């Protein structure tokens, strides 16, 4: 693949005021811009302090200029970077000046992500690494940033390439058997093809597990707090966030609209959504709209916490309204979606400690008990909150302390799952070698295509456009 030959320019730093701002120019020949704006040719890969000049030789700003000859640059093309004072007016003046100076060579404003796209097209990085650049910029936690850096350094790509190499080797053995059926030597039997396939499937499962963990770091979890009015949803939001974010009063229906806050638990972003209380008849039109938005949030949630009042629960069991909410939750969410009943306000109920329910009968377990599906808490005192935090992570399969995660995207997970599916089918075909060897080879090819799509070895132009247009301009 070859990048376009038209030179591009953009402000590479974020909008707003700052101590330093950067204008980046990339293309097959940035010499005219360099000589016109900097007044001289620059020594490659050295920072030179000088004035940046307008078209009349007047000073726009003073700063550092750096020139990177091709192919030893970020994009693989010639790159000029001008580092000046980071005011928006100064940066815009400098960018405009570069575009004027480069008019004769067709210099134009870069599109979002175009510098990184050129780096990909010039084989400076693969597609997974290119995506990791954007993920590192957008990382919302330290753990996410570290995982993105590992992917940017090529750890994810290397794991994929190792799998691809093993699939290719196995395909060669299969193709040899198909091409020379008259040979008495059974290539598959001699090379233990089934054993090789089993190894590939095991390693792919490991990469998929790491990618799932990385996807959690990147996307986080959407956790909706649902329940009747005045059961302590806003208090629980405040308890999880460790700050008074939502208004808490004894008046039912205080929360009329969704309140969203992002917190971190073990490096995972949790998007906690406090919602309007659910009840059959809204008090007014505003509350009715709030309840509709609650159900909209529930349908989009990864986990739903259904809060009930501990005192009422102990005295009368689950109310008809809460029972109806349970039924509605089950109907609105995809099968298998986690719904955890949170019994709140245990500080106002008889001393129950850390209690969870099993079946229809309550029983007491330790705070680190096995897989609770109902948790008793006090959002006011904090009792049970740590247990709830651990349960949220357990429900999504988070493995604490895993330093080898890749910051994966949904398309990576889809490609890995599809590759896994093709290898599973190949394993079934391998059991009927004589009758289905050609099908076995085809499933291996399809699995290889899925894996190659992650690094961009086999990728459509439409997908590339979708990925790179989500970058910021200047990157």
From Swiss-Prot:
Disulphide bond pairs: none
UniProt GO BP: tRNA methylation; tRNA wobble uridine modification
Cofactor binding remark: Binds 1 potassium ion per subunit.
Gene Ontology MF terms in the entry: GTP binding; GTPase activity; metal ion binding
GO cellular component, one term: cytosol
Key word Endoplasmic reticulum present: no
Keywords: Cytoplasm, GTP-binding, Hydrolase, Magnesium, Metal-binding, Nucleotide-binding, Potassium, tRNA processing
Keyword match Hydrolase: yes
Domain of life: Bacteria
Protein residues bound to GTP: 230-235, 249-255, 274-277, 378-380
Compartments it resides in: Cytoplasm
EC number, as in UniProt: 3.6.-.-
Binding-site list for Mg(2+): 234, 255
Assembly and interaction partners: Homodimer. Heterotetramer of two MnmE and two MnmG subunits.
Name recorded for this polypeptide: tRNA modification GTPase MnmE
Gene name of the encoded protein: mnmE
């Amino acid at each position: 693949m070859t990048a376009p030959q038209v030179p591009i320019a953009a402000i590479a730093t974020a909008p707003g005021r700052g101590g330093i701002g950067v204008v980046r120019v990339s293309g097959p020949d940035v010499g005219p811009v360099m000589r016109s704006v900097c007044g001289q040719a620059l020594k490659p890969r050295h920072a030179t302090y000088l004035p940046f000049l307008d078209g009349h030789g007047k000073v726009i700003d003073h700063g550092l200029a750096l020139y990177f000859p091709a192919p030893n640059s970020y994009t693989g093309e010639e790159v000029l970077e001008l580092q000046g004072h980071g005011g928006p007016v100064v940066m815009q003046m400098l960018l405009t000046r570069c575009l004027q100076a480069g008019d004769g060579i067709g210099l134009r404003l870069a599109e979002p992500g175009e510098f990184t796209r050129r780096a990909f097209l010039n084989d400076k990085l693969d597609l997974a690494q290119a995506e990791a650049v954007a993920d590192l910029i957008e990382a919302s936690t330290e753990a996410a940033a570290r995982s993105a850096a590992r992917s940017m350094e090529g750890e994810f790509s290397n794991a994929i390439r190792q799998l691809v190499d093993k699939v290719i080797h196995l395909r060669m053995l299969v193709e040899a058997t198909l091409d020379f059926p008259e040979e008495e030597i059974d290539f598959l039997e001699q090379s233990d093809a089934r054993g090789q396939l089993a190894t590939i499937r095991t390693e792919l499962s490991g990469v998929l597990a790491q990618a799932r963990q990385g996807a959690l770091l990147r996307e986080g979890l959407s956790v909706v707090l649902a329940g009747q009015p005045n059961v302590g949803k806003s208090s629980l939001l405040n308890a999880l966030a460790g700050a008074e974010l939502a208004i808490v009063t004894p008046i039912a229906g205080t929360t009329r609209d969704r309140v969203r806050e992002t917190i971190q638990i073990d490096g995972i972003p949790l998007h906690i959504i406090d919602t309007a209380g659910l009840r059959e008849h809204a008090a007014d039109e505003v509350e009715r709209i709030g309840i509709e938005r609650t159900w909209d949030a529930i349908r989009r949630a990864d986990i739903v916490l259904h809060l009930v009042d501990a005192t009422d629960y102990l005295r009368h069991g689950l109310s008809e309204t809460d029972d109806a909410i349970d039924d509605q939750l089950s109907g609105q969410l995809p099968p298998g979606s986690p719904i955890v009943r949170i019994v709140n306000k245990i500080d106002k109920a008889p001393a129950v400690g850390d209690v969870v329910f099993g079946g229809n009968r309550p029983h007491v377990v330790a705070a680190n008990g096995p897989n609770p599906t109902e948790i008793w808490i006090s959002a006011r005192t904090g009792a049970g909150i740590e247990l709830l935090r651990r349960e949220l992570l357990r429900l999504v399969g988070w493995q604490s302390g895993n330093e080898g995660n890749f910051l994966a995207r949904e398309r990576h997970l889809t490609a890995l799952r599809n590759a896994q599916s093709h290898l599973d089918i190949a394993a079934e075909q391998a059991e009927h070698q004589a009758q289905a060897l050609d099908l076995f080879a085809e499933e291996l090819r399809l699995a290889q295509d899925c894996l190659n799509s992650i690094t961009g070895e086999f990728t459509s132009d439409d997908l590339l456009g979708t990925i790179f247009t989500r970058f910021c301009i200047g990157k």
